[in-house]
Amino acid sequence: MATSTAAVLSPPAVAGLRLAPSPRAAASFRGVSPPARRSVAARAALEPSVVISLSTGLSLVMGRFVFFNFQRENVAKQVPEQNGKTHFEAGDERAKEFAGILKSNDPVGFNLVDVLAWGSIGHIVAYYILATTSNGYDPPFFG
């Protein structure tokens, strides 16, 4: 009886950098086997690269073919004017827009700024889709 009490109350022994197994743990858990491990892998509902690519591509197509004229008309309305003329037409030579970054070979003028803007909108939509599906939200779109 004295040996089992001494084993329970003694400080843990150190063997190298690991703690040596205590006699108490070896005696009490001999009959219990560890539970069988199951191979469970977390799987995403949607492939992120596919969602981001499709969302960005769809956003660029919508920006180029659907919303382009609407966007250009609204930008033209917001140009600063004085007496019905733009500042450049009124004689301010510094009011001319820098055309280097806005120049493109696209027939309607879809330029680098448009690509970056509509591409970022596509990425935002893709992030929203991936975040909501990973939280378990599954909207019944088609049924």
From Swiss-Prot:
Membrane-protein topology: Multi-pass membrane protein
UniProtKB keywords: Chloroplast, Membrane, Photosynthesis, Photosystem I, Plastid, Thylakoid, Transit peptide, Transmembrane, Transmembrane helix
Residue span of the annotated presequence: 1-44
Localisation per UniProt entry: Plastid, Chloroplast thylakoid membrane
Pfam families: PSI_PSAK
GO BP: any one term: photosynthesis
Assigned GO CC terms: chloroplast thylakoid membrane; photosystem I
Membrane spanning stretches: 50-70, 112-132
Family: Belongs to the PsaG/PsaK family.
Function in brief: Not yet known.
Protein name: Photosystem I reaction center subunit V, chloroplastic
Native source species: Hordeum vulgare (Barley)
